[in-house]
């Protein structure tokens, strides 16, 4: 039985952030084509509303909210999301560093989860990893 190649799992990790202070926002993943996409789902007791944008929508207080962000290579959008939702820069730094080891951190009213999603590519069938970060708050989730 032959083993399929494994991409992005054993890749030499480049140090793009050497010498920078903690909380500095630097994207360490591969440059992905396309722009950052944000899907916001507001859940109420009897309804929900889905909104797709390229910039974060300000937090609301009435409903629970799920904010799903894809293609995180635009640091400006991630920084704005952090400002709007009061996310600590250290969490944003961990989100942008796509070579994080799986971890979970607890702080005041926030649970931060970082993990690796493994999947097989469609064309090459190679095993690939992708970082998934979750920020759980009393009013919703950001992924």
Question: Where are the language model's segments positioned?
Answer:
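Peripheral, non-transmembrane regulatory/ligand-interaction domains of membrane transport proteins
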Residues: 1-143
